[in-house]
């Protein structure tokens, strides 16, 4: 198995109060996080400062859930890369299915957001995933690859930019539904994404780029998923708001290091 550094991200989405963020982030920071695993949590934009202040661990990173594709300017309601970096952030989630499906973000917009963040030196957790209808129509790889190809069009073969990308496969039909892709289903897609990368970007880089799984990942299913050779970690939704997230950190560490 290639020595890819395990990655686990917690996406808090639009959840939590100031008091909750303070206590929950403090609890995660107090947990023993090994230096062999990347642990990142993404509170809502209004809670970023609170999370940063509550984080006492050098091993825990705070991320943003979204970023705009332009710099500072007249973009009401948006947040620029420069603003995130001014807060000391180094990670950002881009292209989550809720941004794509609910907010109308296109593949091209997601790719441009990612490119700008990467060019400014951030690490991007780039999300891809298919709906249930698309899976039933046997379009799973077509849809996921189309989303990656949009990013590929922006980044080309730039190893400097791609090395700061973490691909998150999140089947839309599994997010928040409690229906989890089987390890076999998830591994099949991860293999396909890695194959695309090898063929279209860099064969050597394909063995190093991290591809993580999201979609109702929790403490009960992450061990079996993490045993799949092409699943390098998780992007966790609901479970990241619970003490269970610390359990997942421990399980991933045990499984992949």
UniProtKB/Swiss-Prot annotation:
Family the UniProt entry places it in: Belongs to the triosephosphate isomerase family.
UniProt-listed CDD domains: TIM
EC number from the UniProt entry: 5.3.1.1, 4.2.3.3
Pathway membership: Carbohydrate biosynthesis; gluconeogenesis; Carbohydrate degradation; glycolysis; D-glyceraldehyde 3-phosphate from glycerone phosphate: step 1/1
Main localization of the protein described in the UniProt heading: cytoplasm
Residues that coordinate or bind substrate: 11, 13
GO biological process, one term: gluconeogenesis
Any GO CC annotation of this UniProt entry: cytosol
Binding partners and assembly: Homodimer.
Keyword Cytoplasm recorded: yes
Lineage: Eukaryota, Metamonada, Diplomonadida, Hexamitidae, Giardiinae
Catalysed transformations (reactions): D-glyceraldehyde 3-phosphate = dihydroxyacetone phosphate; dihydroxyacetone phosphate = methylglyoxal + phosphate
Protein name in UniProt: Triosephosphate isomerase
InterPro entries: Aldolase_TIM (IPR013785), TIM_sf (IPR035990), TrioseP_Isoase_bac/euk (IPR022896), Triosephosphate_isomerase (IPR000652), Triosephosphate_isomerase_AS (IPR020861)
Active site: 96 (electrophile), 170 (proton acceptor)
Subcellular location(s) per record: Cytoplasm
Gene3D superfamilies: Aldolase class I (3.20.20.70)
